[in-house]
Amino acid sequence: MKPIKEGKVREIYDNGDSLIMVATDRISCFDVILNNQVTKKGTVRTQMSKFWFDMTQDILPNHMISVDVKDMPEFFQQEKFDGNSMMCRKLEMLPIECIVRGYITGSGWASYKETGKVCGITLPEGLKESDKLPEPIYTPSTKAEIGDHDENISYEQSIAHLEKYFPGRGEELAAKLRDNTIALYKKCAEYALSKGIIIADTKFEFGLDENGNMVIGDEMLTPDSSRFWPAEGYEPGHGQPSFDKQFARDWLKANPDNDWTLPQEIVDKTIEKYLQSYEMLTGKKLD
C-alpha cells in the first residue's frame, strides 16, 4: 500500500471512505526536511493530537475516527504504524494555516521590532520579547507546497483567498476560522498553563465535512505545530527554553554551514523535550 500524499513529516493513505494519517519520525525546520529521524516523534504527535481532539469536542468536532491500528486495514497492523497512525474522516481542507499567537516571539517579535505590528495587527508599544499579549492574535497564512514557504496574510486577504475557492462563503469561513482558532487556543492554553506549560503560539488547520460544516483537521497542539515553553522560570525580555523543535532550529541557526543534519546529541535532546511535554500535558508516559 502506498501513500497518496507524502508531506514533510507525514504520509497519508486512502482507506476508501476515510484516510489514514501516519506521523513519521522525520523532522523539518525552516520548511526543509532534515536528514535525521527522531524516534517516537510521530507517536508523540499522534497521541498528543488525540488528547487535544478529545478535550475540545465541545468547541468544534474533529476528523479523528481512531488511533487504534486494530480498527485499520491489515496493512497498518505492523509495529511501525502502531501509535503514530490515525484514521480520519475525509474533509475538504481549507487553504489557510490558522496561526494564533498568545506571546510575542519568533517572526512575530522580529516584525514588531521593525514596525510595531505583527501581520498587519498593531500591538501596544513597549513590549519585550516573549511578553504575553493582552489578547491572543490571529495571524493566518497561506499553505505552501513542499520546498516553498508559507506566506503571512492579513485577515482581509484571508477572506479574498477563501472566496477564490468557496465563492460566496469567503467572509463567513474567514470569520469562523478566526473565531474557532482563538476559542481553541484560549481553552487549551489555560489547561496547559495549569500543567506547567505555556503555549506561546500554535497552528490549526480546518476542513469542511460532507455537509459543509467546519471540522478540525490535521494535527493539534503538538510540538511540531506549536511553541511550548516551561512556565517555571518564564521571564520576558529574551527567548525562552522550549519543549518543541525550537531546540533544533536554534542549533541550525547557530551552525549555518550545516548540511541539514543534526548532531545525535541535538536529536536526543529534541525527543526528550517532545516526551516531556507529552507527559506533562497528559499525565501519561508513552510506552
Feature roles, as predicted:
Residues 168-200:
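A long amphipathic alpha-helix within ATP-dependent nucleotide-binding catalytic cores
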Residues 1-145, 258-287:
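Active-site loop/lid in soluble adenylation, ligation, and acyl-transfer enzymes
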Residues 30, 109-110, 211, 225-227:
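Intrinsically disordered, low-complexity acidic/polar segments
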Residues 114-117, 123-172, 216, 220-281:
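Anionic ligand-binding catalytic core segments
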Residues 100, 199-220:
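Conserved metal-phosphate-binding beta-hairpin within the catalytic cores
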